[in-house]
Amino acid sequence: MCTNTSGNPSDRYAADVVSLNRDLSFRNLVRLAKNDPAIFTHFAERGDGLVTLAVPTRHLPHRYLIGLQGFRLAQYLQLGWACSDVAYRQAIFCEPIGVTHADDEHIITMSPSGRILGYVSLATNGDGETRDLFDPERASYPVEEAHGINIFDHVAPLPGVRTHEVRELKRFVHSRTLTDRTQRLRVTLELLHGLGQAVAAATPAVRTLIGDVEEHVALRHLLMAGLEVQLVEGTAPQLTDHDLLKHAYTERASVKPFVSHLPDAGFAAQQAAMLDETLSSPDLFQAATELPAGQLSRVERERRAA
């Protein structure tokens, strides 16, 4: 059962998982990016040593994929969004590798020592071939599985767009060791910049982004990136007591599915360039404050039919 009751063996197990992943360094992944840049979608190294990169699963050495999945689990355990008793019973120290797909992009920001400071993924639905979004045989995206819906029943897709032109934003998370406000904002912007570069590099072009967000938390990141967001109201998560991530939906404020259609194929590159300029500003907070107003981001709401 997904309870996270304190003081039991699963609590101690979760602490061990967090400790294990806290000591990992991905410094050699930076070396790999410098030695073999063609397999990386994005690489940016700032003057202070902060590094952000994007790499698809198919080019990520297995040991680093395990490490990334471990980072994801460790942060969610600390936030109380992963079920420690499920992790304990299944004896897992990272999120299951099987939930990733070959074309998923992993965007990572690291400290000069190689410690992960922030992470977000750009996920496919895992279909080997492109399908119509209303094809009953197509694989569901994770947000659709969690909420028990076809998200495009609630927000109409762009004409002609198929599964290979849709990506899901997942696991936008900062390291729990990151407490400085300026550094946290910096990492957020670096991840959004890397995400924009990954979207811009995708083939075929990404036309729609989906996922789910807390309205007063991650939604702000989407608006900061200049996205126009349509939220789906009135869904109910379908996760069971045996699901590792049930608490991601029960221990947070309402988590709502969203759809964001990109206006054209060049939009992501344009927004990435704007974020890169923001990151070069001497006053990061002021520059970030000016982003949403300048980009006319907005939120629309779609009520799920009963």
Predicted regions and their residues:
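A short helix-loop-beta-strand connector motif used in the catalytic cores of GNAT acetyltransferases and
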Residues: 96-108, 128-131
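Charge-patterned, long linear interaction tracts outside catalytic cores
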Residues: 293-306
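Accessory, usually C-terminal, subdomains that scaffold auxiliary metal cofactors
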Residues: 216-295
